[in-house]
Amino acid sequence: MNYDPVFDKWHEECGVFGVYDRTVDVARYVYWGLFALQHRGQESAGIAVTDGHDVELKKGMGLLTEAIKELPSLPSHMGTGHVRYSTTGSNNPRNIQPLVIHYQGGQIAVAHNGNLTNALAIRKRLEADGSIFQTTMDSEVIVNLIARSKAETQEERIADAARQIEGAFSLVITTNDSLVGVRDPQGFRPLCLGKTANGYVLSSESCAFDAIKAEFIRYIDPGEMVIIDDSGVRSVIYAKPEKIDKKLCVFEYIYFARGDSHIDGQSVYQSRLNMGRELYNETKYDADIVMSIPGSGTTAALGYARASGIPFAEGLVKNRYSGRTFIKPNQEERELAVRMKLNALPHIVGGKRIVLIDDSIVRGTTSGIIVKMLKEAGAKEVYMCVSSPTIEYSCHYGIDTSVRKELIAATHTVDEIKDYIHADKLHYLSREGLCCAVSDIAPNDLCFACFNGDYSVEVPAEQEEGVKYVLE
């Protein structure tokens, strides 16, 4: 997941999608599946299709429509696709997925969502043993382990590799004769199974099934591998029982996943409505209107408005054509960029006490600009409510987060942050309130590492200050 320096947000990490169907245009199905997952990655995209003998790969930089100008034309019954934000490895054409390799056991195409915590150690061992790496992605470690495995079948080779890697990984892989889905023993990143009329699909999120009219079947369990071929779907629990410890990323519900998805049985949209309700229960602010930062906290703001009876209003308008900014701006440029993307409506906010909902505050650089804009437009008071607890620790499970010292809540109290962003009041949703919001998931099954530093998979010392370029 990437950090947006203008809007002070962590962004989605990657999206993976796969199809096994002998009766459809597989490349087109993968394309539309990736289109539905575009929110999970906007740096690059790739599609690989196969007939079991040959593989055709199309890939490129940018959004899906920019990256894939022409679909693969190889008649095929299997395909996998990937949209990417760089987590480990720089934003470089050689790091575009899926990764396709031909080796003595056949050919495979691998799409990976997540981040491996032991990639550096494995890569050093493999290089010492003669392996050559072409990219700076941790995902390339996976294909090397598969290729070097002594197991007899491709599926067994994949399981063998999966048992050696640690951290976050949801994989969609095509082999010579099957489509394979693999989820790590903690289930950090989502992966689900769907059914087409005559085949099956795998996806990071259930929302992508709707795009191709596929039927949702179930979620892939932590530590599980599914193998799809002409005989149907087989399931293997590849991980050792003592390794399986469900820890679903709670930020999928707060911000990452699309609102119309269900992640492991929990509606993302309902979760966000509930977060707004819980924010009201914890604050009971007396205000005139409830607002959100467009595209960030809107559903939670609706939940707050419903619970409180305070009217919801759109007091900020977003310029949908402003695009993303990948430069690291100085404060003046950041303020200009925010003002280019957002504009306050004086006739809506003038003289009002505003409850402003956001889903998170990472560095605090943008919140103050928005509060300033609202007050310049005549707002009487601004009460900032955040639908997540304070982010005090970096994530090492598929998110390119800031180093800890750059996280404002790691070095400042809530009162200090309130003063820094010039809000009249500031409240973060408690962990207890968050658990109430994500009510269909047991609290012990959620990962809160970015809030409390409780890492369920050990993080090597060399990665404690960030993992993005650790393999370069």
Regions found by a protein language model. Name each.
Residues 26, 87-88, 118, 188-189, ...:
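Flexible loop/turn segments at secondary-structure boundaries
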Residues 131, 151-152, 282-288, 306-313, ...:
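Secondary-structure transition/capping motifs at alpha-helix termini
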